[in-house]
Design a protein with these regions (language model features):
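Active-site machinery of serine-nucleophile hydrolases
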Residues: 56, 60-113
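Short, proline-enriched alpha-helix->beta-strand connector loops that line the catalytic pocket
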Residues: 88, 171-176
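A domain-start/cap signature at the N-terminus of enzymes
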Residues: 17-56, 133-135, 140, 145, ...
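Alpha-helical scaffolding within the catalytic cores
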Residues: 72-83, 160-169, 190, 194
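Gly/Ser-rich "nucleophile elbow"/oxyanion-hole loop immediately N-terminal to the catalytic nucleophile
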Residues: 44-52, 100-137
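C-terminal catalytic histidine-bearing segment of alpha/beta-hydrolase fold enzymes
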Residues: 159, 175-240
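Primarily recognizes the serine-hydrolase "nucleophile elbow" in alpha/beta-hydrolase
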Residues: 117-122, 128-172
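Bacterial Sec-dependent N-terminal signal peptides
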Residues: 1-22
């Protein structure tokens, strides 16, 4: 996709809080004039340790958090975690999908790529440890973006989403940890399971956690677990 123009407007909002969270809202106009705002978190030692490259995690929210109010993005997932954990060891980027789009749309996928490119260019990101995760609509977006750019990510964590079976051959070398609730009636567990089975048949690096008694919210337990972040950090992609 050829980018016709790129208007980059960056507003930095610094706040002092218990979690030492630094937040930035970005209004980023690209092809088709998508305004993409996001929450941005830097680890507490980012400025004091000037020689470290930091892992980055991209979080994609669900359908109900679309719109133009960034407060909605803070309700679930990574934005909620960074408010609670002082020592969260990732740069965290949590964009908000405009109401008229979903994450799987081609224009949104391009907007996410452009957003990550800007972050990598302007911050000390360890390019061997860039991860993508999302829930529900964001779970679908995680599958799609990982398939679009498997060269960019070191691992992916789609939660209660689903993917395109045609992309399995592209994804088979990417470490993927899939989560779903066994009683999910919004996005059926089969949406995750068909991708897991196909990746297993292809020899993929996939693992699957099914919460037998969970409904659609299979993300709270997932993002609350230190094991998730340990697993992410254990995965690096080869140097370019």
């Amino acid at each position: 996709m050829i980018q016709k123009y790129f208007l980059f407007i960056l507003t930095i909002i610094l706040s002092i809080s218990f979690a030492q969270q630094r937040k930035m809202e970005l209004e980023d106009t690209i092809k088709n004039e998508i305004d993409l705002k996001y929450l941005f978190f830097l680890p507490k030692d980012y400025y004091s340790d000037k020689n470290t490259g930091w892992p980055l995690i991209l979080f994609l929210h669900g359908m109900g958090e679309r719109g133009a109010d960034l407060e909605l993005v803070k309700i679930h997932g990574i934005p909620k975690i960074v408010k609670e954990q002082i020592d969260f060891p990732f740069i965290a980027v949590s964009p908000q999908c405009p109401i008229e789009y979903v994450w799987r749309d081609d224009d949104m996928q391009q907007a996410l790529e452009n957003l990550l490119q800007k972050i990598v260019e302007n911050y000390r990101v360890d390019k061997t440890r860039i991860y993508v995760t999302g829930l529900s609509m964001g779970g679908y977006g995680t599958w799609s973006l990982a398939a679009r750019r498997p060269d960019l990510f070191a691992a992916a964590v789609p939660i209660c989403g689903g993917g395109d079976l045609a992309t399995v051959i592209i994804l088979k070398n990417l470490p993927i940890w899939v989560f779903h609730g066994g009683l999910d009636g919004v996005v059926l567990p089969e949406e995750s399971e068909k991708m897991v089975r196909a990746l297993e048949r292809a020899g993929g690096k996939v693992r699957y956690t099914l919460y037998p008694k969970a409904y659609h919210d299979s993300w709270t337990e997932t993002y609350d677990s230190p094991a998730l972040y340990d697993w992410l950090l254990s995965n690096r992609k080869a140097e370019d």
